[in-house]
């Protein structure tokens, strides 16, 4: 725990053993900016402590509350403590860990595209693909089978081996 906090402090303050780190912005243009893991003042579970408070421009009530904060915390009510917390942080851990309903949108889009694809396939089968060939009808398939049997094709292991030519039926 301590090593993680120390590493976080070193990374935030910019104390590095080398001039540029692996993931640092670099000194190519002479910039001394450092990349903070905390972006846009929104807390993340991996980095919940912001470098700067959530609210930087305070109203008169909030300034008075900040002055009252410098005194004893036993004098503060629960609502004032919550208001001070909200000045510093955007969300609580419970709010950060709360599940979003984004999965509903994703699943809706997935089902929409599956339905659209099914409509395109149906349209292609009806209007684009040619009609069934005549040779695929049941009558033609029966004629082809009879022709193969008449030619006695593959008499050892094929169709002719399972056909009884005397009784004109399949062997049992």
From Swiss-Prot:
<feature type="region of interest" description="Disordered">
    <location>
        <begin position="13"/>
        <end position="32"/>
    </location>
</feature>
<keyword id="KW-0999">Mitochondrion inner membrane</keyword>
<dbReference type="GO" id="GO:0004129">
    <property type="term" value="F:cytochrome-c oxidase activity"/>
</dbReference>
<feature type="transmembrane region" description="Helical">
    <location>
        <begin position="102"/>
        <end position="127"/>
    </location>
</feature>
<keyword id="KW-0812">Transmembrane</keyword>
<dbReference type="InterPro" id="IPR004203">
    <property type="entry name" value="Cyt_c_oxidase_su4_fam"/>
</dbReference>
<dbReference type="GO" id="GO:0045277">
    <property type="term" value="C:respiratory chain complex IV"/>
</dbReference>
<dbReference type="InterPro" id="IPR036639">
    <property type="entry name" value="Cyt_c_oxidase_su4_sf"/>
</dbReference>
<dbReference type="GO" id="GO:0005743">
    <property type="term" value="C:mitochondrial inner membrane"/>
</dbReference>
<keyword id="KW-0496">Mitochondrion</keyword>
<protein>
    <recommendedName>
        <fullName>Cytochrome c oxidase subunit 4 isoform 2, mitochondrial</fullName>
    </recommendedName>
</protein>
<comment type="similarity">
    <text>Belongs to the cytochrome c oxidase IV family.</text>
</comment>
<keyword id="KW-1133">Transmembrane helix</keyword>
<keyword id="KW-0472">Membrane</keyword>
<comment type="function">
    <text>Component of the cytochrome c oxidase, the last enzyme in the mitochondrial electron transport chain which drives oxidative phosphorylation. The respiratory chain contains 3 multisubunit complexes succinate dehydrogenase (complex II, CII), ubiquinol-cytochrome c oxidoreductase (cytochrome b-c1 complex, complex III, CIII) and cytochrome c oxidase (complex IV, CIV), that cooperate to transfer electrons derived from NADH and succinate to molecular oxygen, creating an electrochemical gradient over the inner membrane that drives transmembrane transport and the ATP synthase.</text>
</comment>
<dbReference type="InterPro" id="IPR013288">
    <property type="entry name" value="Cyt_c_oxidase_su4"/>
</dbReference>
<comment type="subunit">
    <text>Component of the cytochrome c oxidase (complex IV, CIV), a multisubunit enzyme composed of 14 subunits. The complex is composed of a catalytic core of 3 subunits MT-CO1, MT-CO2 and MT-CO3, encoded in the mitochondrial DNA, and 11 supernumerary subunits COX4I, COX5A, COX5B, COX6A, COX6B, COX6C, COX7A, COX7B, COX7C, COX8 and NDUFA4, which are encoded in the nuclear genome.</text>
</comment>
<dbReference type="GO" id="GO:0031966">
    <property type="term" value="C:mitochondrial membrane"/>
</dbReference>
<keyword id="KW-0809">Transit peptide</keyword>
<comment type="pathway">
    <text>Energy metabolism; oxidative phosphorylation.</text>
</comment>
<dbReference type="GO" id="GO:0005739">
    <property type="term" value="C:mitochondrion"/>
</dbReference>
<feature type="transit peptide" description="Mitochondrion">
    <location>
        <begin position="1"/>
        <end position="34"/>
    </location>
</feature>
<feature type="topological domain" description="Mitochondrial intermembrane">
    <location>
        <begin position="128"/>
        <end position="172"/>
    </location>
</feature>
<feature type="compositionally biased region" description="Low complexity">
    <location>
        <begin position="13"/>
        <end position="22"/>
    </location>
</feature>
<dbReference type="GO" id="GO:0006123">
    <property type="term" value="P:mitochondrial electron transport, cytochrome c to oxygen"/>
</dbReference>
<feature type="topological domain" description="Mitochondrial matrix">
    <location>
        <begin position="35"/>
        <end position="101"/>
    </location>
</feature>
<dbReference type="Pfam" id="PF02936">
    <property type="entry name" value="COX4"/>
</dbReference>
């Amino acid at each position: 725990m301590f090593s993680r906090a120390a590493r976080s402090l070193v990374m935030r303050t910019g104390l590095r053993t080398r001039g540029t780190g692996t993931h640092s912005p670099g000194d190519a243009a002479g910039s001394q900016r450092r990349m903070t893991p905390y972006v846009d003042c929104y807390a993340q579970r991996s980095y919940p402590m912001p470098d700067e408070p959530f609210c930087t421009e305070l109203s008169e009530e909030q300034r008075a509350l900040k002055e009252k904060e410098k005194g004893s915390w036993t004098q503060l009510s629960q609502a004032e403590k919550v208001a001070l917390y909200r000045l510093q942080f955007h969300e609580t851990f419970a709010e950060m860990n709360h599940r979003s309903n984004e999965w509903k949108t994703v699943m809706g889009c997935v089902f929409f595209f599956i339905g659209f694809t099914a409509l395109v396939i149906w349209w292609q089968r009806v209007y684009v693909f040619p009609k069934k060939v005549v040779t695929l009808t049941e009558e033609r398939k029966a004629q082809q089978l009879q022709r193969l049997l008449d030619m006695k094709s593959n008499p050892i292991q094929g169709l002719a081996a399972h056909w009884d030519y005397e009784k004109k039926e399949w062997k049992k």
